[in-house]
Amino acid sequence: MTQLNDLPLQTLQFYATAPYPCSYLPDRQARSQVATPSHLIQSDVYSDLVARGFRRSGMFTYRPYCDGCQACTPLRVLAGEFRPDRSQRRAWKQHSILQTRVLRLCYEPEHYQLYLHYQRARHSGGGMDHDSIDQYTQFLLQSRVNSRLVEFRDPAPDGETGTLRMVSILDVLDDGLSAVYTFYDPDPDCSYGTFNVLWQIEQARTLGLAHVYLGYWIAESAKMNYKSRFHPHELRVHGEWQRGT
């Protein structure tokens, strides 16, 4: 098996952060292993890192490195073999009318306002519900890899712009797509989050890419449960990708 000191990763250095409060499991401390320097993490290197369980937040490339805890498990959907279940088919039917536009990373006030609306409705008190424009930009709009911003809007007559319902940031890798972050209209009667994953799976198939990386799945975290509902998928356990159940 290749190691972190093999090409092309031997040019990178890895360090562990100090402990900080875990965002997902209460009363636990987390640590991250961070890859540096960021200017050397271009698309090919980043693809290799993601396949080894890393992901990014802005220019920060990391993976969990917690003391005595391995709850965060990287998960990727096998796009070519994916078959939706009944609820996923409903979500696709409900929202397939949305019109998409794929863009380079860019700041738009409309995107930022939807981001704040989403954070305040879904993650109130979590800190991100008061993110400044600079914080939003650093989190989502800074990248050295092959990243895209996707708008999802209601259909509108010619010459008009439909209501913005969802924005997704994704990275295009050598072997798949990596879901960086998605925010959307928090209407409880809609299934925008599920539809977004389905859309990314369909895009991966169209591009001939094998995987959609959904980040980390935590069995004990209710907010992470949705990831394991996309079958078939693989989990990275003890350094190896294994088929999930």
Curated annotation (Swiss-Prot):
One of its GO terms (biological process) is ubiquitin-dependent protein catabolic process via the N-end rule pathway. One of its GO terms (molecular function) is leucyl-tRNA--protein transferase activity. It is found in: Cytoplasm. One of its GO terms (cellular component) is cytoplasm. InterPro entries: Acyl_CoA_acyltransferase, Asp_Glu_LeuTrfase, N-end_Aminoacyl_Trfase, N-end_Aminoacyl_Trfase_C, N-end_Aminoacyl_Trfase_N. It comes from the Bacteria. Functions in the N-end rule pathway of protein degradation where it conjugates Leu from its aminoacyl-tRNA to the N-termini of proteins containing an N-terminal aspartate or glutamate. This is Aspartate/glutamate leucyltransferase.
